[in-house]
């Protein structure tokens, strides 16, 4: 693994001019290196090429500093497009999409595709990255929001142990 000095020297090559002084980095790295940083990225960011590339650059910087990042991403705009292609009209209750089995299949596909794009871009930036399909990894225990919404629920329990195992595999 690279030394901190090597990492800082490498960062100088792409550190933004308008960012805080690069000499300030070590104190923040020390503070957050042992933490799990969770970044929520909305689906709109992922369909805007400029925002998406900036997002990937920011994650790559954190990775190269040794700060573990967990990305939680949305997919609303792409889900909407994919549903429209199949002539599936969405209905909402209080902002939540009513999700039947057919809709859920489209949602899962769209999110897996986004996940793959994020991983591919991060690997091109020499970052270790892996996807996590929560429906296949039993990371969450969920309870149904209400029957009218179908496959919409709230997390009841999150398996930190499984998440930590995945993070450890990335080191």
Describe the function of each predicted region.
Residues 1-171:
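Nucleotide/pyrophosphate-binding catalytic subdomain
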């Amino acid at each position: 693994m690279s030394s901190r000095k090597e990492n800082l020297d490498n960062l100088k090559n792409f550190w933004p001019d308008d960012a805080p002084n690069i000499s300030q980095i070590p104190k923040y790295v020390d503070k957050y290196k042992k933490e799990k940083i969770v970044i929520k990225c909305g689906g709109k960011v992922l369909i805007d090429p400029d925002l998406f590339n900036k997002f990937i650059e920011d994650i790559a910087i954190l990775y190269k500093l040794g700060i573990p990042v967990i990305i939680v991403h949305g997919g609303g705009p792409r889900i909407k497009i994919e549903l429209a292609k199949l002539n599936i009209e969405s209905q909402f209750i209080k902002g939540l999409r009513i999700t039947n089995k057919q809709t859920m299949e489209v949602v899962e596909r769209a999110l897996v595709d986004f996940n793959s794009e994020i991983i591919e871009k991060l690997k091109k930036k020499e970052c270790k990255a892996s996807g996590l399909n929560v429906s296949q990894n039993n990371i969450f225990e969920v309870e149904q929001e209400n029957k009218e919404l179908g496959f919409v629920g709230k997390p009841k329990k999150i398996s930190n142990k499984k998440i930590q195992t995945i993070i450890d595999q990335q080191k």
